[in-house]
């Protein structure tokens, strides 16, 4: 029986650790041609990990040719030629280091920290194998530039059923995450136009918009979200919003405020709303509020969504729905660009959605995050009136204001020394301001 050491508190997933350990045993000659690997069930029991974790590791070894599968028998080591030792020496000076290594924390309370336990490893692995078996040759051909039609149709059906949106698949563009799609959008909006943004905001979007010398107009928030009076006084031609769960404050924008912003957009032909439907799947009290796109009668809303938040950060698949006016600009200026998401990933996600697995995953994840959300709030209540909790009815994070004789920087620094990662509100603000607010994941 294989005995390898795996670290549960490690940034690398367990299946990847196991895959690398076994691969090392094969390449070092400790496991040789014809050696049989333990059964998935047996190794899982021996290492006290899930069978799906072992299955993913074995699947990766099989995909790379290190092992073969013999029907009704199991996994066996393939013949692997040893790498010439002289060649190995040529690489000894290369440092195996990340360019910008992230420090490891015992407790990560950054707002983009996700619960890995909710990821459906076994189902994702099964669908991957199924797609390779059923569509293998097709997936090696170039796909449609806006993303495979099957995936765009699947997403459109999901949005209709669960967000009340009527979306035309031809208006949808698939891309490797929201960041990439915002870069595309940057080229569709007149370069001289000002883009308004909530302040505080999602700083990755701010960096993208401002990277090409685009003028960005920060707009303050009140208890209902972005202030329309300030927006009306600005010269902005587009506004970036996260109305379902404002990032990072957690404010859920009410219908009245949404309609006011839609009225602003209707005031001029070249005005648009960029709606990032951030964390819309996770609402813990009351009925979900429909996205602005659902009440957009003037074809003014650019709608953005991503699966990186709901499934896993490594699933770099997002989508952007363009109004007809901007779709014409896209086809004129950027239609030559190929889709940045591998076709196999698109195929797996398509089956994941159409098979009902995504819906079940969201329901399971919502229960997990609701439980974590309630436990976090309960734990924070022991601080009494020294803590004010904001944005606690939805999303995967909440904001906490501390009444302490310390600056935000001091709180974050002291937490870091104790192995706790916290993120202060100033990290999300356009312009330098000091707070004692922190964003915490639920």
Show which residues each predicted segment covers.
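Acidic, serine/threonine- and proline-rich low-complexity intrinsically disordered segments
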Residues: 209, 408-409
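General small-molecule cofactor/ligand-binding pocket signal
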Residues: 173, 217, 302, 390, ...
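N-terminal basic, amphipathic alpha-helical segments
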Residues: 1-129, 140, 335-342, 350-353, ...
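PLP-dependent aminotransferase class I/II
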Residues: 301-382, 388-392
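Residue-level detector of anion-binding/catalytic polar loops
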Residues: 215, 272, 421
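Conserved core of the PLP fold type I
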Residues: 131-133, 138-269, 281, 287-295, ...
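Short, polar loop motifs at secondary-structure junctions
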Residues: 200-202, 426-429
């Amino acid at each position: 029986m294989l005995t390898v050491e795996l670290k549960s508190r490690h940034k690398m997933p367990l299946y990847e650790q196991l895959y690398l350990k076994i691969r090392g045993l094969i390449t070092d000659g400790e496991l040789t041609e014809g050696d049989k690997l333990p059964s998935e069930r047996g190794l899982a029991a021996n290492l006290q990990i899930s069978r799906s974790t072992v299955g993913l590791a074995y699947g990766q070894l099989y995909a790379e040719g290190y092992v073969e599968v013999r029907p009704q028998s199991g996994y066996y080591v393939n013949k692997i030629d040893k790498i010439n030792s002289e060649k190995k020496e040529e690489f000894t000076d290369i440092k195996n280091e990340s360019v910008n290594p992230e420090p490891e924390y015992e407790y990560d309370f950054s707002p983009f920290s996700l619960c890995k336990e909710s990821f459906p490893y076994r189902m994702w692995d099964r669908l991957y194998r199924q797609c390779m078996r059923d569509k293998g040759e097709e997936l090696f051909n170039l796909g449609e530039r806006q993303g495979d039609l099957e995936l765009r149709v699947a997403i459109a059906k999901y949005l209709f059923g669960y967000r009340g949106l009527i979306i035309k698949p031809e208006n949808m563009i698939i891309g490797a995450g929201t960041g990439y799609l915002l870069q595309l959008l940057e080229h569709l909006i007149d370069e001289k136009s000002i883009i308004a943004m909530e302040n505080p905001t999602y700083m990755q979007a701010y960096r993208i918009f401002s990277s090409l010398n685009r003028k960005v107009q920060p707009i303050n928030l009140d208890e209902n979200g972005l202030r329309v009076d300030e927006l009306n006084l600005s010269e902005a031609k587009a506004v970036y919003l996260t109305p379902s769960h404002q990032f990072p404050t957690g404010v859920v924008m009410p219908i009245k405020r949404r309609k006011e912003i839609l009225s602003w957009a209707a005031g001029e032909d070249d005005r648009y709303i960029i709606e990032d439907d951030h964390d819309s799947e996770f609402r813990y009290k009351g009925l979900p509020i429909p996205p602005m796109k659902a009440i957009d009668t003037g074809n003014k809303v650019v709608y953005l969504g991503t699966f990186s938040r709901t499934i896993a950060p490594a699933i770099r698949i997002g989508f952007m729905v363009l109004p007809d006016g901007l779709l014409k600009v896209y086809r004129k200026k950027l239609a030559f660009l190929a889709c940045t998401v591998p076709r196999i990933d698109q195929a797996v996600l398509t089956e994941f959605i159409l098979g009902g697995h995504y819906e079940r995953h969201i329901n399971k994840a919502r229960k997990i995050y609701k439980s974590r959300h309630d436990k976090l709030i309960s734990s924070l209540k022991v601080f009494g009136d020294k803590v004010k909790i904001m944005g606690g009815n939805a999303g995967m994070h909440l904001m906490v204001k501390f009444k302490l004789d310390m600056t935000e920087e001091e709180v974050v620094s002291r937490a870091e020394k104790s192995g706790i990662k916290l993120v202060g509100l100033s990290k999300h603000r356009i312009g330098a301001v000091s707070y004692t607010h922190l964003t915490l994941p639920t």
